[in-house]
Amino acid sequence: MYLKSFNQFINESTISAGSTDADQLASILKKYVGKKEEGNNSGEMVKGFLKSVGLGTGNPWCMAFVYGVFDEFCKAKGIPNPLPKTGSTLAFWSKVPAENKIEKSKAVNDPDLVKPGQIFIKSRSGGGHTGIVIKVEGDSFVSVDGNSSDMVKVNRYKIANMIGFADFFKSDSLSAQFAQSTSSIISSNAPTEGGGKEV
């Protein structure tokens, strides 16, 4: 059984809503930006992400990247990972509790609901794609995605093109600190409009 949000840990003072924990999560994310897979959905980095969700090399790894980043943070903090453990984007979305979901219609009508630290869910031919939101820009957002053009990549998408967003922060202050902590990612990596190749 997974937990509902990081806000529970904030309330228990296991993690803080301040910069320290946001910086730690951002640092984990930053170290992977620009790293490429080796071969087809393989290499040590990809192997580690896929292993975190119980899969072997050769599988698509965008969802495993998201889970793996949060899992690395949770293990460092000694807390359970609240994300559903799966390597499938659409299976992940189906397992996200209703209180953690922001459906597309709500996000389009109120883009302020979309916040840094959330996990976007996007449909694609043959499955889905996902990544971690780091900045919101009106009706668009910037994210860091695994398995985008065979690497960990910075992309920009339209909110209207998503299935929805999963919010496991449930904390405006943590989201704001995470945005600040990840701002250097955007300044050194120009986002690709519409994302990269997803396989």
Residue spans for each PLM region:
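N-terminal capping segments
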Residues: 10-81, 176-178, 185-199
